[in-house]
């Protein structure tokens, strides 16, 4: 018996492994896998249904059809296992060996493997340096190739047509050999000397100058080196033996009616075997060459079809005209092996049903229908019944359960107690889409769900279904309880805000409860506490909204956790005092002493979590919900048509607007305004009218007049149902009420442009036919968009997860001093996001000093929590350096200090947390809320007047940043630098506003001057770019010849004349090389120098510049010499929403990107070509850099101006690749983070920056080697950044020269495919290409990421699996050291003793 158990144990023993290697298999290797050669194309005998011998299903090769029984039936039963029957040759064993025993086919002629031939770039072609077309001609028998030139003038690898071959044959006889077919290619590959090739190419690389040649050689060199390193032999890309898949993986299933369903592979194999056998016979018969050749070609084609059908030529089709599914099709695509069976599987012990509300449940509970529970927990019930002795066997237990005896229900109750179940709602967009609950048995057939978790699941009760899963093992139950229980997931992993937030009814109830009303019963009472307030309310002595004074006792918990109580009289209402009863101790009364809307309630829960911890918050959340539902029911809020009050002012407003539109129409007809201006103006008029009507309506709805106790009239907030719903945030918004009671307003066409006739009616008044038609027009587009959006958003999430899946927190601290600089987000005059909000949950990278002193306020490596945020606010810190995932120094994954706080848990992130996947989910999940459309700046959307001044919005002082300026004769400052910024700082030194200062602005305030709110600080001309002189002197024109380089115009009205510089292209031949300029001279006619430099004050004039001053005039410092008219930035569509986010993460180059300065230096312009200008930057070292710029681009720089590397030379959207190259990693991180946040902020979605940074880290994981140093890398090769870091560390330790490199920014799709792990890349996209490349270079996958481990079926190295993997590696390290000699002796003795004692 014992050996039987051991035998059964040995049946499913899995090998422990740490890596997977892929490579090319040699013919001998294929033969060694094989259990015999398949010689016949037959499958099974159609009469006996037994497999044919030597056929595709042969039992002798692949194993028995029935467990422990040979084919002829001579040996049956377990006792004969391992015997090989002498009659039929079948081994007696389990039938499951038919799943893993392979066969093989000996090919009569070699065949090229199509993946290495046709998967671009063709590996065979690249290796032999012969174009793919020629190789195909040889393989498919259209041409000869010379394999041995002998003493002739032919070259090895030369192609010959049939005629040429025959000619040469006559000329040289058998001096040389030329062959066709795969055999020829095999000979050529076999005769290549890899090492010699590599040497030769290395020399070529050093000598060649042409870039294209270098690229080509590098590519080929990499391939050759891969072959050398991996030990693959190039000959193996040509098959001489074909492996045959085990038969149970390509089954033949009998259908009823005597027909068979078969896998397509059997058809494909049959074809190969038939052609192979025919070829063997033809070769034995010595058939004519042409027939053999044709057969060989057909064999090649049939093997191609088996490996990858349809890759070359037309796909082979089956009987029903459907292309056959080849081996390659089995693994790729959504239905392929990787994505269908390895990454997502169907599971047992699960059920699904419709969900309904469970308002009486606690937060950790869900209602589970009894029927469902009984089915799901069957095994547990059976075992309980048996251990209790209520059933003798499992079968009896099964009968009891089927009869549903009373005792079964009792046992079900026991089994379910404290056994959590998982609830999941598809689509699972983030990790909160699966949570654990304790089941409560209920009657009925619907699952009951706690209302507060709906937000996390994005569920509602209009027919949504949910799936239930049962965690079976103890470990699984433990994880479900500690990690996935709904009570442990109160905060959203995306933003760290509470996600268990009441909505709708609950909000309405609490809002109603905390409102106040003037002069109702009980006003002015003095109450001794919340309990008495409740008594007064219950006995109808006071109304819920009555203003009263109540004695309130607060508990205050200080830093050290000591609590003190304070009692005071508070002006409040009866409802608020009653609500105070459920608020846990430790929160201030002020937090409920206000009208509670959705925002306030969210804040209340957040405070509770931060101050009181998890347990109290959960209990509080439940209480809030029960209370909210109760008072919502009591409030009796409903919607009636009379609640929508149309403001009387509406009709006059509309009449006025129609009058204005009529005026503009008249102006248009008389030609005073253009069609575009008319359209924009009309839309502006209607948009502002709509706003005014809406304002009047809201004022009307939101307040009512009442009589107070003194008998005077007073305004109070209205108790109008619709207004209360919107004001509390329960349902609806001002925009929707506007359509009900104001006017519907402007509608959009499906393409996003705005229809200029608005709908002046509202829904209460009703729409006429035309209005209805206009409103359906844009509304249908919305529905179509939603469907597209979901698919697109899902695909974005998939790409994000794929790129970030291997970012796991692997260590506590990587020790880096790097980080990113944090500043508050300021746009114009508003602080959009405060610094404390940005820094919350981050770790400080460098000591933060107290502003204005050298004292350390926050030491390095401090995790910024709410307490520190307060200290920062108090000390008005306005910038700090925090650690970031992008700058983390860990080789694999990232470290806890660089990541900072785990947003969903509120403490420093744990090791093993899969932060990459969380980042991907956090960015992808709100994707469905983003819009699909590109915003047309049409009319009201955003035609802000061009700015031409800065007005201060706050009191404070002015600060100028990288500004150069001169003071003009009026004592104003004139800005003469490009990228200047002006900030306004309050008395604590905090930045309040940030404005861009264009070149030529006039400042009325200097640096550090005080400014008051509302003052104008700077102004400039909006549509012209001035050229300003920095010195005083007399003007002298250079090369300004009338009619050649300039044209003069005199204004008829004013009589003033001005000269306009002609574009170089439009000048007559004489003026082509002239460069018009203005130079400044002193009285004697000598050049005036620009102060502080050796450069004369020369101002070159670009084309289109207008000069208003005369030659010889005197000018002062800061005067304008010339003006260049600027085109106004026409209506560009800005891509918004999802497409914009996708563009950013795919790192796509914009159409016309901004041109940035490649170097720091001085700008000048060189010789122009037909359509381009030549921009020259002279560096301080004297080196010259030139760039050609198209003429139509408007440049921001003048001749002789200094630029810094990375400065904008021509405006446009910036390309992230340029930012990375010129401004570095920090700048590109900031750029992508800000741009992505911009899109999400518009939709009101909060995402923490660190998620975006995590993705950016993955986009930056490759770099290009610029100089190899002493490393193994090739210049120009793309390598994983971590590899270079490790290599350089080792080189530096040995005192050698490290490699130099440039970081690369890859889009997320590219980055996923460029990952180290070929398993992960293959399961993402382009499976064939990835696997081909991996096989050729003999790649090894170390299974570091999550995806690879899921695919090979191991625990993932994250979360609880992280510890498991660490322990395993430690054990292995120990085992490798091995036991000492004494230990080994002891072990042996112990074993022998144990053996003796057991036999007695």
UniProtKB/Swiss-Prot annotation:
Cystine crosslinks: none
Cofactor(s) required, per the database record: Mg(2+); Zn(2+)
Binding residue positions for Mg(2+): 460, 462, 464
Listed EC numbers: 2.7.7.6
Binding site for Zn(2+) 2: 814, 888, 895, 898
Reaction(s) this enzyme catalyzes, per UniProt: RNA(n) + a ribonucleoside 5'-triphosphate = RNA(n+1) + diphosphate
InterPro entries found in the cross-reference section: DNA-dir_RpoC_beta_prime (IPR045867), DNA-dir_RpoC_beta_prime_bact (IPR012754), RNA_pol_asu (IPR000722), RNA_pol_N (IPR006592), RNA_pol_Rpb1_1 (IPR007080), RNA_pol_Rpb1_3 (IPR007066), RNA_pol_Rpb1_3_sf (IPR042102), RNA_pol_Rpb1_4 (IPR007083)
Region called Disordered, residue ranges: 1368-1400
Domain of life: Bacteria
Gene Ontology CC terms, in alphabetical order: DNA-directed RNA polymerase complex
Pfam families: RNA_pol_Rpb1_1, RNA_pol_Rpb1_2, RNA_pol_Rpb1_3, RNA_pol_Rpb1_4, RNA_pol_Rpb1_5
Cofactor note: Binds 1 Mg(2+) ion per subunit. Binds 2 Zn(2+) ions per subunit.
Keyword Magnesium carried by entry: yes
A GO term for molecular function: DNA binding
UniProt entry tagged with the keyword Magnesium: yes
Residues holding Zn(2+) 1: 70, 72, 85, 88
Protein family (similarity comment): Belongs to the RNA polymerase beta' chain family.
Role played: DNA-dependent RNA polymerase catalyzes the transcription of DNA into RNA using the four ribonucleoside triphosphates as substrates.
Name of the protein this chain belongs to: DNA-directed RNA polymerase subunit beta'
Species this protein is from: Vibrio parahaemolyticus serotype O3:K6 (strain RIMD 2210633)
Gene name tied to this protein: rpoC
């Amino acid at each position: 018996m014992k050996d039987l158990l051991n035998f059964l144990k040995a049946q499913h023993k899995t090998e422990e492994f740490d890596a997977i290697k892929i490579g090319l298999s040699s013919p001998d290797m294929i033969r060694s896998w094989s259990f015999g050669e398949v010689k016949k194309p037959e499958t099974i005998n159609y009469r006996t249904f037994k497999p044919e011998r030597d056929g595709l299903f042969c039992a002798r090769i692949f194993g028995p059809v029935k467990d422990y029984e040979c084919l002829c039936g001579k040996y049956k039963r377990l006792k004969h296992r391992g015997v090989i029957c002498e009659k039929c040759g079948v081994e007696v064993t389990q039938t499951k060996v038919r799943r893993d025993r392979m066969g093989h086919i000996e090919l009569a002629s070699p065949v090229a493997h199509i993946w290495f031939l046709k998967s671009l770039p063709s590996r065979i072609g690249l290796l032999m340096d012969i174009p793919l077309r020629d190789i195909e001609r040889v393989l498919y028998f259209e041409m000869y190739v010379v394999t041995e030139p002998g003493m002739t003038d032919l070259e090895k690898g030369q192609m010959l047509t049939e005629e040429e071959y025959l000619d040469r044959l006559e000329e040289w006889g058998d001096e040389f050999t030329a062959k066709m077919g795969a055999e020829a290619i095999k000979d050529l590959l076999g005769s290549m000397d890899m090492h010699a090739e590599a040497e030769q190419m290395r020399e070529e690389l050093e000598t060649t100058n042409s870039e294209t040649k270098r690229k080509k050689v590098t590519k080929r060199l990499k391939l050759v080196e891969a072959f050398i390193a991996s030990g693959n032999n190039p000959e193996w890309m040509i098959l001489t033996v074909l492996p045959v898949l085990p038969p149970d993986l390509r089954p033949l299933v009998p259908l009823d009616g005597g027909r068979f369903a078969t896998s397509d592979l059997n058809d494909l194999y049959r074809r190969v075997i038939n052609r192979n056998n025919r070829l063997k016979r033809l070769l034995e018969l010595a058939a004519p060459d042409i027939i053999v050749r044709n057969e060989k070609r057909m064999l090649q084609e049939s093997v191609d079809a088996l490996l990858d059908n349809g890759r070359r030529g037309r796909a082979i089709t089956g009987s029903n005209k459907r292309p056959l599914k080849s081996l390659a099709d089995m693994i790729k695509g959504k239905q392929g092996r990787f994505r269908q069976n390895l990454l997502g599987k169907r599971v047992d012990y699960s059920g699904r049903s419709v969900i309904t509300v469970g308002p009486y449940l606690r937060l950790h509970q869900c209602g589970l229908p009894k029927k469902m529970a009984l089915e799901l927990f069957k095994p547990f019930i059976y075992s309980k019944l048996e251990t209790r002795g209520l059933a003798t066997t499992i079968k009896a237990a099964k009968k009891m359960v089927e009869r549903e005896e009373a005792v079964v229900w009792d046992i079900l109750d026991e089994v379910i107690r404290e056994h959590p179940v998982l609830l999941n709602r598809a689509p699972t967009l983030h990790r909160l889409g699966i949570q654990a609950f304790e089941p409560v048995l209920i009657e009925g057939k619907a699952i009951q769900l706690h209302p507060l978790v709906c937000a996390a699941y994005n569920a509602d009760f209009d027919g949504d279904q949910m799936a239930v899963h049962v965690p079976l093992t103890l470990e699984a139950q433990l994880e479900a309880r500690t990690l996935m229980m709904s009570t442990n997931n109160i905060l959203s992993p995306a933003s760290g805000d509470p996600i268990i937030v009441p909505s709708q009814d609950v909000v309405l109830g609490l809002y109603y409860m905390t409102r106040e009303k003037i002069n109702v019963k009980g006003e002015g009472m003095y109450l001794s506490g919340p309990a008495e307030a409740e008594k007064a309310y219950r006995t109808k002595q006071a109304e819920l909204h009555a203003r009263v004074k109540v004695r309130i006792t607060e508990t205050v918990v200080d830093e050290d956790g000591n609590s003190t109580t304070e009692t005071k009289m508070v002006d409040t209402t009866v409802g608020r005092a009653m609500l105070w009863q459920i608020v846990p101790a430790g929160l201030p009364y002020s937090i409920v002493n206000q009208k509670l809307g959705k925002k306030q309630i969210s804040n209340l829960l957040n405070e509770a979590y931060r101050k009181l911890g998890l347990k109290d918050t959960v209990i509080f959340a439940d209480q809030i919900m029960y209370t909210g539902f109760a008072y919502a029911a009591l409030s009796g809020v409903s919607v009636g048509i009379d609640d929508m009050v149309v403001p009387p002012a509406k009709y006059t407003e509309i009449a006025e607007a129609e009058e204005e539109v009529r005026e503009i129409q008249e102006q248009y007809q008389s030609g005073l305004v253009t069609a575009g201006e008319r359209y924009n103006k009309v839309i502006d008029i209607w948009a502002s009218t709509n706003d005014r009507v809406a304002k009047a309506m809201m004022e009307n709805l939101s307040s009512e007049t009442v009589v107070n106790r003194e008998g005077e009239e007073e305004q109070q907030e209205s108790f109008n149902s619709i207004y209360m719903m919107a004001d509390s945030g329960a349902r609806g918004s001002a925009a929707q009420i506007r359509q009900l009671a104001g006017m519907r307003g402007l509608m959009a066409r499906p393409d996003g442009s705005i229809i200029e006739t608005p709908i002046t009616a509202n829904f209460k008044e009703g729409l006429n036919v035309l209005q209805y038609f206009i409103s359906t027009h844009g509304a249908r587009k919305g529905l179509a968009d939603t469907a597209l959006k979901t698919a697109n958003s899902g695909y974005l999430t998939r790409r994000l997860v794929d790129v970030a899946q291997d970012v796991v927190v692997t260590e506590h601290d990587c020790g880096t001093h790097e980080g990113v600089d944090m500043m508050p987000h300021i746009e114009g005059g508003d602080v959009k996001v405060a610094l404390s909000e940005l820094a919350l949950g981050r770790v400080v990278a460098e000591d933060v000093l107290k502003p204005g002193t050298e004292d350390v306020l926050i030491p390095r490596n401090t995790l910024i929590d709410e307490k520190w945020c307060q200290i920062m606010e108090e000390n008005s810190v306005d910038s700090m350096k925090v650690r970031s995932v992008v700058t983390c120094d860990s080789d694999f994954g990232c470290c806890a200090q660089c990541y900072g706080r785990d947003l969903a848990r509120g403490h420093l992130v744990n090791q093993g947390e899969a932060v990459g996947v969380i980042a991907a989910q956090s960015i992808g999940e709100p994707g469905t809320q983003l819009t699909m459309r590109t915003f047309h700046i049409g009319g009201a959307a955003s035609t802000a007047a061009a700015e031409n001044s800065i007005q201060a919005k706050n009191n404070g002082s002015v600060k100028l940043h990288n500004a150069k300026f001169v003071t003009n004769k009026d004592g104003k400052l004139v800005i003469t630098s490009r990228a200047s910024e002006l900030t306004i700082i309050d008395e604590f030194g905090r930045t309040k506003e940030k404005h861009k200062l264009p070149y030529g602005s006039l400042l009325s305030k200097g640096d550090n001057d005080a400014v008051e709110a509302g003052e104008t600080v700077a102004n400039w001309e909006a549509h012209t770019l001035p050229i300003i002189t920095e010195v005083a002197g007399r003007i002298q024109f250079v090369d300004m010849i009338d009619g050649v380089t300039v044209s003069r115009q005199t204004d008829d009205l004013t009589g003033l004349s001005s000269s306009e510089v002609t574009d170089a292209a439009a000048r007559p031949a004489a003026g082509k090389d002239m460069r018009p300029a203005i130079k400044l001279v002193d009285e004697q006619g000598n050049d005036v120098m620009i102060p502080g430099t050796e450069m004369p004050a020369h101002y070159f004039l670009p084309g289109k510049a207008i000069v208003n001053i005369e030659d010889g005039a005197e000018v002062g410092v800061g005067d304008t010499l010339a003006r260049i008219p600027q085109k106004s930035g026409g209506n560009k569509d800005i891509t918004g929403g999802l497409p914009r986010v996708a563009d950013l993460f795919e790192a796509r180059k914009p159409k016309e990107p901004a041109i940035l300065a490649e170097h720091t230096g001085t700008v000048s312009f060189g010789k122009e070509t037909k359509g381009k200008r030549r921009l020259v930057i002279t560096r301080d070292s004297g080196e010259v850099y030139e760039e050609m710029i198209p003429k139509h681009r408007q440049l921001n720089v003048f001749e002789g101006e200094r630029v810094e590397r990375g400065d904008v030379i021509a405006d446009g959207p910036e390309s992230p690749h340029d930012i990375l190259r010129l401004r570095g990693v920090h700048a590109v991180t900031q750029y992508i983070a800000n741009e992505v946040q911009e899109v999400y902020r518009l939709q009101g979605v909060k995402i923490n920056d660190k998620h975006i940074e995590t993705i950016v880290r993955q986009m930056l994981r490759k770099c290009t080697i610029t100089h190899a140093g002493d490393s193994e890398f090739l210049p120009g090769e793309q390598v994983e950044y971590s590899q270079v870091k490790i290599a350089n560390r080792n080189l530096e330790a040995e005192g050698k020269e490290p490699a130099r490199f440039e970081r690369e920014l890859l889009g997320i799709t590219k980055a996923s495919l460029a990952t180290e792990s070929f398993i992960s890349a293959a399961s993402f996209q382009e499976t064939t290409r990835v696997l081909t490349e991996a096989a050729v270079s003999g790649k090894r996958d170390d299974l570091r990421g999550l995806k690879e481990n899921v695919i090979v079926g191991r625990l993932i190295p994250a979360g609880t699996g992280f510890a498991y993997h660490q322990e395993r590696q430690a054990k292995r390290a120990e085992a490798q050291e091995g036991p000492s000699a004494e230990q080994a002796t002891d072990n042996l003795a112990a074993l022998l003793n144990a053996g003796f004692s057991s036999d007695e």
